[in-house]
Regions:
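Active-site-adjacent loop/tail segments of enzyme domains
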Residues: 11, 18, 44-74, 100
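Residue-level signal for inorganic ion chemistry
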Residues: 23, 43, 62, 80, ...
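Short acidic-glycine loop/turn motifs at beta-strand connectors
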Residues: 48-50, 84-87
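Anionic-ligand binding region
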Residues: 63-67, 78-80, 87-91, 95
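GST superfamily/GST-like fold recognition
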Residues: 72, 95-164
Length: 164
């Protein structure tokens, strides 16, 4: 699966469709290579209005991301897919709304130096010092971290893949 090519194909479609399709394609690829295993795929997209914030390409891009999110409400969108025997058996979409505090350039630079969140869409790690960047979080924190665990565990239990 070429993720960049797929993102271009999905451009303009609803975020829920984009993120669940990306999760599905990731899981399907591995599932076809491991047909007797349950495979979980996941994808996240950070959005502010109609703009998607991918992982930053460099430090300057990271600063620009955080400056755009500073003082604003944005969404972390998560898609999950479970595949078995090369077929998708379940998918889920979840969204968490976050409001970032107003940040100065120095606060942004200090945060980037501290957490180095360059591999995260939105350019922050909620599970670490990034938590301090927000005035409110409405939804599942696990969605922000890349995998809506509550929904996944519930489905794995329902499918008797795990037992709670």
């Amino acid at each position: 699966m070429n993720e960049n090519l797929l993102k271009k194909e999905l451009f303009g479609k609803p975020i829920s469709k984009q993120v669940t399709r990306l999760a599905s394609e990731k899981a399907l690829k591995v599932s076809k290579e491991n047909p007797k295993a349950y495979v979980i795929g996941s994808d996240n997209m950070c959005t502010l209005d109609d703009k998607i914030f991918d992982k930053p390409i460099d430090h300057k891009d990271a600063v620009n991301h955080l400056q755009a999110l500073s003082g604003n409400k944005h969404l972390q969108n998560n898609g999950i897919s479970i595949c078995f025997d090369g077929k998708e058996i379940w998918s889920n979409f979840d969204v968490t709304e976050l409001v970032m505090k107003e940040l100065s350039l120095q606060e942004i630079e200090d945060y980037l130096d501290l957490d180095k969140p360059y591999s995260a869409c939105g350019c922050y790690h909620l599970e670490s010092n990034g938590r301090n960047l927000f005035s409110s979080i409405n939804g599942l924190e696990s969605t922000v971290m890349g995998l809506a665990m509550e929904h996944l565990i519930e489905k794995l239990n329902e499918l008797s893949i795990i037992e709670l």
